Amino acid sequence: MEDRLLVTASPHIRDHSTTRGLMGNVVIALLPAVLASALIFGARALLLVVVTTFACVAFEYIYERLLHKTNTVGDLSAVVTGIILALNMPVGMPLWIAVVGAFVAIVITKQLFGGLGYNFANPALVGRIVLFLGFTSRMTAYVYPDMAVDALASATPLASSVDRHAVSLLDMFLGLHGGMMGEVCVLAILLGFAYLVATKTIQVTIPVTIVATVFILTTLNTGDPYAALIECMSGGLLFGSVFMATDYVTSPFTTKGKLFYGVFIGLITFLIRHFGSMNEGMSYAILLGNLMTPWFNAWGHQTPLGYKKPKKAKKAAEEGGKA
């Protein structure tokens, strides 16, 4: 009987979740997108994923080795960063540029700030933004699925969203159009999302709130729900909502905070897409959301049961004088 009693100090939290287990679930959830990109764009897509992931793992191992830090390669976080970063690139991206992105993501964004748990933003997200700013022409060199790697598409469905018939909904659902490797196939993203929710790796709050906000605002702005649906299925909205905005370290942990965070990202994405100079604003919206996370947590903090707000000093003095 005594062996069944807990005699340690509180809090008594019993959870079998580990960083490696959670990251392993994310890797599994990313596999449909990886497989879809290989089927749609060919073996070059797999090569880009392998090289980028290997570079992320290598940079993490070398950095920690040189600075005599505990090796964290085994927690799979670098693997997740590598896969997500690769899926945020077009299939024709030169491999050396992918390695540059891996360096920015792992060394600059993650390790220099203290490693996993201390980074200010999602490492893969920062890597994508830096590559987009530094190699814009390469990052926008989209490839049609049925063409060779050097045959470039003129625009993605998001850029062509004015034309309702530029790409059919079925083609968008199956990924039969140009774009970033991991963003084109809606089916693969939804399969990964379903797995993450089923394994309780993430909650639905953030992704659903982001997509719903963009859909509602776009419908109100255009008066066309079909156009809003096209916007939600194109670009990096779905992929970013599921795999990047839900990062444990850089997203809120309170329920209200998650709602504020999702609405904020959806709002910024909508504003950039419709009133900014870029077709896609998801990356910048998530980055701003990451930076705002401490405030979202503070605003969403639940008041303890039985808590009584202290009276202001002046009001308390007046009541004391009346007494």
PLM segments and residue spans:
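Membrane-interface helix-loop-helix junctions at boundaries between adjacent transmembrane segments
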Residues: 77-78, 83-149
